[in-house]
Amino acid sequence: MTAQLNKVRKAIINGCNPAMISDLLDDLQDKHVLKDYEVEHINKKNNTSRDRCRDMIDSVKKKGEYSSNILLESLVKNHKTLAESLGLHEHAPSPIQEHNEDTIKDKEINSVIPCSAEEFKNIYDSHGDKIYEVREREGRKRLALIICNETFQSMSERRGAKLDLEGMNKLLNELGYQVQQHTNLTKAEMVKAMKEFAAREEHADSDSTFIVLMSHGDKPGVCGTDSKKTENGQYGVTNLLQVDEIFSTFNNVNCSRLWDKPKVIIIQACRGENQGGELVRDDVAPAPLEDDAVHHVQTETDSICFYSSTPDTASWRNPTKGSVFIIRLIEKMNELAHCQPLGDIFLEVQSSFKDKSPNQYSQMPTQERSTMTKKFYLFPGY
């Protein structure tokens, strides 16, 4: 539809009048294609009807196929004479516009399903100011941080970690985030990387962030590459990145540019050695699936943390496929991010771990101490 709108763009501009433009802007605003401030900007910025019309069309085109389709449909339904002169006629919604849920369920989903204009409108109509604001793509600078430790000075290699890194990188890119990626960092280097990321000026032009940590772990924290298991240490491991350090780095004092914006922390690491099953673990002791675990201390406002397992238990990783938690998280995000808030998607991930047979390796991801005050929709494609 963007190509079709581009084809008739000049003719629409030449045939427009003030009343028609006002009608179209009202319709686009009602259907959440254009926001209030965008309509106000179009009206105030332009002195002539032609300029207003040109600005309106170009603003809609930038939003993609769905938005372009809505503008053309509005033109056909409300301004038939002009539409007919342009060769535009009423048509059924395109297959892209309406997701066929049966088709989606019947095949493996390897990429994020985009949010349609209809879904976007329905979500805003249903929830309104109860959802976190999503900034327009133009000028938006979403950032995400991934730290993935695979090799260690005194611990086993986390085989399969590269697959987790590739999968999370792809997922976050498809959700519109520019990923800052680090591998094999010591505890001090992890702290430095987080502080530098928290200080980035681009957060002022963002609407949210993801922080993903994947490593070996123990109950109080996440292992750096220099972590070692001790005989008499309080927690048994040295050089742990304490979970409290993660949250304090991104609180409203230390990361003010992300104030009032969702901050999503995802941790794939063991939190102990108790097993709900057996694969390979990401605790400090070697085990063939491998496990990862960690403990949560404090969260800040508008934050949510999703752990790969409950306290004192292991998290499992397949050396040839990647971590079970990361695999299922990516699957559910690909499938549901277009229509469900993040908290509900996390519940779907948790449900996928429930009621496994005694012969299967078990773990239970947990959402802990969320301080989200609204629903967080990702609206992929917007």
From Swiss-Prot:
EC number annotated for this UniProt entry: 3.4.22.36
Residue ranges listed under propeptide: 1-98, 283-292
Domain of life: Eukaryota
Gene Ontology cellular-component terms listed: AIM2 inflammasome complex; IPAF inflammasome complex; NLRP3 inflammasome complex; plasma membrane
Main location class: cytoplasm
BP GO annotations: positive regulation of cytokine production; positive regulation of interleukin-1 beta production; protein autoprocessing; pyroptotic inflammatory response; regulation of apoptotic process; regulation of inflammatory response
Originating species: Xenopus laevis (African clawed frog)
UniProt KW keywords: Cell membrane, Cytoplasm, Hydrolase, Membrane, Protease, Thiol protease, Zymogen
Quaternary organization: Heterotetramer that consists of two anti-parallel arranged heterodimers, each one formed by a 20 kDa (Caspase-1 subunit p20) and a 10 kDa (Caspase-1 subunit p10) subunit.
Identification of the protein by name: Caspase-1-B
Subcellular location per the Swiss-Prot or TrEMBL entry: Cytoplasm; Cell membrane
